[in-house]
Amino acid sequence: SRFRPGWLARSSMVAATLTGADSYWVGDHLNGLVPRSIATPEYLGIAAKLVPSVDANYEPWTMLGNLAYGRPKRLRLGICVTDAGRRNPAVTAQAAATLQLLTRGNAILGIGVGEREGNEPYGVEWTRPVARFEEALATIRALWNSNGELVSRESAYFPLQNAAFELPPYRGKWPEIWVAAHGPRMLRATGRYADAWVPIVLVRPGDYSTALEAVRTAASDAGRDPMSIIPSAVRGVITGRDRDDVEEALDSVVVKMTALGVPGTAWARHGVEHPMGADFAGVQDVIPQTMDEQTVLSYTAKVPPALMKEVVFSGTPEEVVDQVAQWRDHGLEYLLVINGSLVNPSLRKAVAASLPHAKVLRGLKKL
């Protein structure tokens, strides 16, 4: 970046705080989710100027440790989400526990299976990501609950033999574990282990409530209070001064890239086959750094407009708040907001969307 390391993240954190956010999150990726072939001002607008290289990502735990100092004391810091396989769970347990101490009890460990793009190109085994995830969660819990005693645990992926873990919780409290889960097996694991559920690619409120019920059933089966698990979600927000600005942003190549991350079944509902195959599983199998410009343009040209309106919350601030309220009525309690308006190719319209976006955030606080 042309700015000093951490400037953009800290500025974003301050802006989020000023608009009433009570948590700030960073992702965990070795490379970007936007193909480098379209990471240009033509497609990314002002975002390309702020971040000239989409594949130059800071290590998130180091970044969060830096942000922990000077942040408002009430602000929680989270990672959304770290990989269960690319990082050894003992190291993840250590990193999250460290951040919990640095933030005085305000750290959140978001975790999921990760994506193919951040694992397979780097030599990380990707044939059984869910099994690795389950073992990683069990390992983290085993270390945190060890009370300093040596831990030995059999595992096909992360065996422990006389493993020591003596970092203490902050005032008896470990970081909350928020799990990004979508499929049946992941939803069951969420119910067994998680403090919160934070899906990323569910596109309809009815699908959300159905999956939430599966999480709560799994929690009950595991002897846990099903209502103790926080129903959350990560969603992009596209807003602007008027409907025309919003529609222009929704039709941009970068925003439509998000639709490539939803499964082929979601496309089929709109009568269109996913360009990567009818049975394409979704964001976990996208490898953006290998996609050339023409491929991206041909794929995004096929995105049904109606699907885009399912993938993100979009519209005027009032319309966005109404859409979130519908999800709230289906069980959503905590929303992680991605400001998608910033990637409008028009610099003027991206900047103009900042006030409507702030209005959205203020409206969400009132729900």
UniProtKB/Swiss-Prot annotation:
The enzyme class is: oxidoreductase
E.C. number(s) listed in UniProt: 1.2.-.-
Instruction: Note the Gene3D superfamilies from the entry.
Output: Luciferase-like domain (3.20.20.30)
One GO biological-process annotation of the entry reads: lipid metabolic process
Q: InterPro entries this protein is in?
A: F420-G6PD/mer (IPR050564), Luciferase-like_dom (IPR011251), Luciferase-like_sf (IPR036661)
Respond yes or no to whether keyword Lipid biosynthesis is given for this record.
yes
Entry's Pfam families?
Bac_luciferase (PF00296)
Superkingdom per UniProt: Bacteria
Q: Any idea which UniProt keywords this protein has?
A: Lipid biosynthesis, Lipid metabolism, Oxidoreductase
Q: What does this protein do?
A: Catalyzes the reduction of the keto moiety of phthiodiolone dimycocerosates (DIM B) and glycosylated phenolphthiodiolone dimycocerosates to form the intermediate compounds phthiotriol and glycosylated phenolphthiotriol dimycocerosates during phthiocerol dimycocerosates (DIM A) and glycosylated phenolphthiocerol dimycocerosates (PGL) biosynthesis.
Q: Which family is this protein grouped under?
A: Belongs to the mer family. Phthiodiolone/phenolphthiodiolone dimycocerosates ketoreductase subfamily.
Q: What is this protein called?
A: Phthiodiolone/phenolphthiodiolone dimycocerosates ketoreductase
Organism for this UniProt entry:
Mycobacterium kansasii
